[in-house]
């Protein structure tokens, strides 16, 4: 896992926004929600923005997380989605 300090900074459960930046494609938001659903089932309404040139999309989804390990796992799995450049 990652060596983070989320457990020192957050009181769990906590609302945590994940922003995923990836190559522009219609299914990126669906792929992000599918990964989140596997670990934290719920009803998610991601927001999407295209870059100024339209080459990239950023998808933001707020997730209620229950542990630092859950945050770290989501960072790892979201980064593994095809075409993803960054997870913030």
From Swiss-Prot:
GO terms for cellular component: cytosol. It holds the Pfam family DUF493. Disulfide bonds: none annotated. SUPFAM superfamilies: YbeD/HP0495-like. InterPro entries: UPF0250_YbeD-like (IPR007454), YbeD-like_sf (IPR027471). It comes from the Bacteria. Belongs to the UPF0250 family. This is UPF0250 protein Shew_2940.
